[in-house]
Amino acid sequence: MTIDEMQAVLDELAEELPEVLYKELNGGIVLLPEAKESEYSRRGEGRSDLFTLGEYHHGGAMGNYIKIYYGSFEHIFGYLSDEDMKKELRHTLRHEFRHHIETLAGDKGLIKEDESFLRDYLDGALPVRGRKSGPLRRL
């Protein structure tokens, strides 16, 4: 899937969500071309094993927005069919929207889940998943 094709799919997936979820998401959804290696990635055998698929940002000069990393999707899921890639993209987008909604509500449930995932990852308790990467989690 090219970046232009992914942008079209991302636009379609964004339209699936109710308008109310976009409250205070003033920076929208941004698709970036790069892959983003997680700061927690364990490097071995000349490769990284944890990449960030998406991020939610809130506050600051840019306001609230969601970043999706095309390069990370290609690195991890580049072997998938377009339909399966769309499923992974949908899952990530909804994960980031959950961060947005929980942040507005003052809830830290998903943040705690992500922290638990990272603890397990750093302890080596997670199986390898994906084509070129390790554990899969949308942080």
Model regions: which residues?
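Metalloprotease/metallohydrolase-associated module, dominated by Zn2+-dependent proteases
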Residues: 1-88, 103-139
